[in-house]
């Protein structure tokens, strides 16, 4: 039931992320995050709703992802403390890479060349209204939906409750991950991540060579 609960809440904030990505691509005529940056002042609605989705998927209360993710983590800790910690660390990694995405698009340094060719702009209401609608659902659906009254496969009522210790641990891990992403990617000049990549260039190149882009990009181009 925890998995089904998370599947439901995940549908809301993940749809919000995908629609937000569509608005961003529509605004800048590019899907390369490396060409973006500083878009928050051009796209305030997309910016705020995208931030809400990132907070939800990171598991920050009171957004819906917090409630459903915590049910999964509680079940994992009940099964095995080792499994619980593994899943908690993975959840922290999710918070980190989502805020890397958020800062890379809406903060950081503006791409002056891209903006000179095409000034970014907020999407029309036909595109931003679904964002606002999904953002509102993302905020409230975690604590107003009656998932605690659902029944399990054997007919017993499913007991949904927050484990205070698990919840506190997951929040601390998520906040640390978000702060780390903020430190590395939110700067408007040279992000800390770029400085670390330059300092450890050999390790950075080795890690980059392991990325799937070297497989996926030639395959995509061959299929076009």
Residue ranges and their predicted role:
Residues 1-34:
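Alpha-helical multi-pass transmembrane bundles of energy-transducing inner-membrane proteins
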Residues 75-80, 156-167:
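Membrane-interface segments at the starts/ends of alpha-helical transmembrane spans
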Residues 59-72, 141-156:
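Membrane-helix interface motif
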Residues 213, 218-224:
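Single conserved hydrophobic/aromatic residue that forms the stacking wall/gate
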Residues 14, 18, 83-119, 170-199:
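Predominantly late transmembrane helices and immediately cytosolic-facing juxtamembrane segments
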Residues 10, 36, 65, 102, ...:
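Divalent metal-coordination and catalytic microenvironments
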Residues 5, 9, 85-86, 165, ...:
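Alpha-helical transmembrane segments of multi-pass inner-membrane proteins
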Residues 26-63, 73, 79-91, 115-140, ...:
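Interfacial and helix-entry/exit segments of alpha-helical transmembrane bundles
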């Amino acid at each position: 039931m925890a998995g089904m609960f998370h599947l439901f809440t995940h549908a809301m904030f993940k749809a919000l992320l995908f629609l937000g990505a569509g608005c961003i691509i529509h605004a800048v005529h590019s899907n390369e995050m490396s060409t973006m940056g500083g878009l928050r002042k051009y796209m305030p609605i997309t910016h705020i709703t995208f931030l809400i989705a990132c907070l939800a998927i990171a598991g920050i209360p009171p957004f819906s992802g917090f409630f459903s993710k915590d049910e999964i983590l509680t079940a994992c800790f009940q099964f095995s403390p080792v499994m619980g910690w593994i899943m908690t660390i993975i959840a922290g990694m999710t918070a980190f890479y989502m805020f890397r995405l958020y800062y890379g698009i809406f903060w950081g340094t503006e791409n002056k060349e891209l903006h000179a060719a095409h000034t970014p702009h907020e999407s029309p209401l036909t595109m931003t209204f679904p964002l606002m609608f999904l953002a509102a659902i993302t905020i409230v659906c975690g604590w107003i939906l009656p998932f605690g009254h659902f029944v399990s496969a054997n007919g017993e009522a499913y007991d949904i409750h927050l484990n205070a210790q698990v919840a506190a641990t997951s929040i601390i891990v998520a906040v640390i991950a978000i702060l780390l992403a903020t430190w590395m990617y939110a700067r408007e000049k040279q992000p800390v991540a770029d400085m670390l990549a330059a300092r450890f260039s050999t390790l950075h190149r080795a890690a980059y060579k392991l990325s799937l882009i070297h497989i996926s990009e030639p395959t995509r181009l061959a299929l076009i």
